[in-house]
Amino acid sequence: MDLKFNINEDYSKLLVSDMKKKLDKIYAGGGKEKIDKVHKKNKLTARERIEYLVDNDAYFEIAEFAGYGKYEEFGGCPCGGVVAGIASINKKLCLIIANDSTVKSGAWFPTTAKKNLRVQEIAIENHVPIVYLVDSAGVFLQLQDQIFPDKENFGRVFRNNAILSSKGIFQVSAIMGPCVAGGAYLPIMSDESIIVEKTGSIFLAGSHLVKAAIGEIVENEELGGAKTHCEISGITDYKAMDDKDALDKIKSIFEKINLKENKSFDRIKSEMPLHESSKIYGIIPKEIKDNYDVVEIIKCIVDKSEFLEYKKDYGKTIVCGYARVDGWSVGIVANQRKIIKSSTGEMQFGGVIYSDSANKAARFVSICNQKKIPIIFLQDVTGFMVGSKSEKGGIIKNGAKLVNAVSNSIVPKITIIIGNSYGAGNYAMCGKAYDPRFIFAWPNSKIAVMGGEQAAKVIMQLNKKAYKKDDPEYREIIENYNKSASAYNAASNLWIDKIIDPAKTREAISKSLEVSCMKEINESYSNGVMQT
């Protein structure tokens, strides 16, 4: 009996259970009372609409924790007020964005705009169609200054509508509730639009504002309902009797879309790993600073648990190699967390990037680009090695080689944060700033400039205070720092696309590759100037 394995396993399962409880609360949206109110209007909720629309077992939700813990003074904004995910409709891959009208009548919070932009970014990067299920009261006015004016705010959504269309990426909108003010442009800038009778409406200004502005008295249905826009203005293309009829029309549209399957990347018949995926629970240490062998985790993820390791005996603090995940050919770059001994006899800390490991990883990333093989990054990194020996050995220039290779990579990159993601190590291992097609994190992960204890020591020193481990101020700094470094804070701010169950990592990678491989690679790989 492996006591340490069992302790790790119990702790990991506890973290996953806690995540699922949080998700259940998020899935409830604005609560039962608001859901009942939607049903009384003969409407479906955002999640009910998606469930009816997509193929069975073909929905992979993303960004569920968007806005988590934010806007509490306004009653919160579960899921960022909008439900989004990857789906299949009539066996055609797509992205879905659905306003949740149970959350402040579907009003746009700052996070709502950011989440919409992220989904559109995924669509542009991967050439995937988008379905918009519109049911929104418009901008949440109390926070308009955080939603309206900046480049990556509300207006960028409509700019992206135009860019998507120009690239031949199909967009369809269903207006299933209000669609007002600036938001009215979203469905109109889609390729096709559907409006539901009596519940759907589109206008730049509602009846109350029209009366106040020009004195005209007119009902919303006449102002911007289905009859007006399908028969008079010609703005919308299809009229639907109710939500299900609108969704059926989307299904019919997708049945006729000509989406060519991309053959750019190699995939064969999938085979399951020899190791159970749940074994990961016992490998992940309860204490995030403890050591483990990352190869054991890789073997729980890849087909037949087969992993061809590249330069196995060189640069050992980063593990590189080839494998298949659900049949897809991939390259894997992973931080090795166990302490290793180099061929020169040097003891090297796990999770730290040294010159030799940086050089190895940079070359491997380049080779994967040469072969057109997608790259999976498994991040558990505390940073680059410091000290006079490392500086004289060129750690900065060698680290820069890896950053350069990752930055210029043209193949799909998918990042999984499985533990620590600290400082420049986050950058070198394809953090958010380096355009991974998708970035996920396990519930135990930490994303910050440095660890909580190190940060607390630095802060205390800057404040010219001596610290003791039982000092309340010292402990408070660590607690606050760790909270801000948590996976939940990262997900709330959309620094990551999803917090995933570690045992479901293989499925998350496969779904990401399915999306990423929709777009052919036409560019050639080229690095910039490198210091040698």
What are these regions (language model features)?
Residues 1-532:
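Ligand-binding clefts of soluble mixed alpha/beta catalytic domains
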